[in-house]
Regions:
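Extracytoplasmic/secreted envelope proteins and their assembly/folding machinery
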Residues: 3-7, 36, 54
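Secreted/periplasmic proteins that engage bacterial cell-wall peptidoglycan
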Residues: 1-21
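Aromatic- and glycine-rich peptidoglycan recognition patches
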Residues: 15-34, 46-48, 52-84
Length: 84
């Protein structure tokens, strides 16, 4: 799932973040989308992704489509969180 994907990426680099997308929406420091940097969490209603720059995110979309790159604004952004 989406939060498991972001949890695993951060964990692989030695960072601890909460497990669910709801909890991840509160971790780290909030920043404006206009200041987003690669590695920031982009939080949506019931979904979370990682910003990779250039207005793009990488995320676990669905079981059928798997991990994919999408435009960050493909749905309304609720929060941007900087963990690192």
């Amino acid at each position: 799932d989406c939060s498991g994907f972001t949890f695993r990426i951060y964990s692989d680099f030695g960072y601890s973040i909460p497990r669910t997308s709801y909890e991840q929406r509160s971790c780290g420091t909030g920043v404006d989308y206009s200041s987003a940097q690669p590695g920031d969490l982009i939080c949506y209603d019931g979904h979370v992704a990682m910003y990779i720059g250039g207005g793009l995110i990488v995320h676990a979309s669905t079981q059928r489509t798997g991990i994919k790159v999408s435009n960050a604004n493909y749905r309304p952004i609720l929060a941007v969180r900087r963990v690192v």
